[in-house]
């Protein structure tokens, strides 16, 4: 089981960090934070980044996994020198349930050059602007089943590309493929990276993120950095990022998603409007250089890092 492997790896890493010549130990997510006390005993400065409320994810909702992850969340809130969060929603959550002040440092993204369709044409028969794209881990909270259901009711000749791999969710992936049936226009690419990933982002007509639950989705930032028109669910973790630069639908509402998809399929000019605004906006507001500088401040213990990250328009041109 990957969960057990992750647990033992986190324990081993915490031991190595405790005895290693490190000043700061940075834990990512609640699960590994269970072992934060080990390097803490050795006088290390311990930082935790909370990427989302992981114990609430569908695959952990019941049983030991959820309780274990929530215990790690408690350890992080109580004992970490600093807790970094990626969204205001999670920041409010830690204040409400643990009375813990946190540092808000969202994910960042770099500007990207768009690639012409080459590998994706050879591998999957895809061409520019001829497909709707979703890219994520194939887990239930990502809402891909909503997208397939909505897509099957569309009047369009555009294909649906679902890029991503299972995450201990083989049963869910099997269900998705059963929903798709023998429709040749629904394409599962599996895990993609490198040039193939870049080409998928670069040539999509629309990028869709139908999640029920998120931390701060890096794939959303990447999709917009490539100049994509985005349709996302109206959860705070997406809506707060995109503001008015993307199209939102009601979370888990297949009918509303279908209407938004049909709208963009029928209105090329609307899609081009969102595409023209996406990259400049997202790369200006969520710049990796800012993220790195603020994270280093947290490592050093500067209190100024607790100020909310604001848009720096001069960075957008870099």
Go through each PLM region and give its residues.
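Membrane-proximal helix-turn-helix segments that form the acceptor-binding/catalytic region
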Residues: 15-18, 41, 65-83, 97
């Amino acid at each position: 089981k990957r969960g057990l492997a992750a647990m033992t790896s986190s324990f081993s890493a915490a031991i190595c960090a405790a005895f290693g010549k490190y000043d700061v130990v940075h834990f990512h997510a609640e699960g590994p934070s269970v072992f934060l006390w080990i390097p803490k005993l050795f006088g290390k400065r311990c930082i935790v980044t909370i990427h989302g409320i992981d114990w609430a994810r569908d695959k952990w909702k019941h049983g030991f996994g959820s309780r274990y992850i929530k215990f790690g969340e408690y350890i992080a809130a109580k004992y970490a020198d600093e807790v970094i969060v990626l969204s205001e929603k999670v920041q409010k959550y830690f204040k409400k349930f643990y009375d813990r002040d946190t540092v808000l440092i969202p994910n960042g993204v770099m500007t990207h050059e768009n690639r012409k369709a080459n590998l994706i044409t050879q591998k999957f028969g895809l061409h520019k602007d001829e497909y709707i794209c979703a890219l994520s881990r194939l887990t239930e909270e990502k809402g891909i089943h909503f997208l397939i259901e909505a897509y099957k009711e569309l009047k369009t000749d555009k294909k649906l590309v679902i890029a991503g791999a299972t995450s201990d969710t083989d049963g869910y992936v099997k269900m998705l493929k059963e929903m798709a049936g023998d429709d040749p226009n629904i394409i599962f690419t599996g895990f993609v990276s490198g040039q193939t990933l870049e080409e998928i982002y670069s040539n999509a007509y629309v990028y869709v993120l139908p999640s029920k639950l998120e931390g701060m989705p890096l794939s959303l930032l990447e999709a917009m950095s490539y100049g994509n028109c985005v349709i996302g669910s109206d959860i705070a973790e997406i809506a707060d990022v995109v503001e008015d630069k993307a199209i939102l639908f009601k979370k888990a509402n297949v009918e509303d998603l279908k209407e938004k998809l049909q709208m963009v399929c029928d209105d090329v000019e609307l899609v081009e409007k969102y595409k023209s605004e996406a990259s400049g906006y997202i790369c200006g507001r969520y710049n990796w250089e800012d993220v790195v500088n603020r994270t280093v401040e947290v490592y050093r213990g500067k209190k100024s890092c607790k100020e909310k990250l604001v848009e720096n328009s001069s960075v957008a041109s870099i």
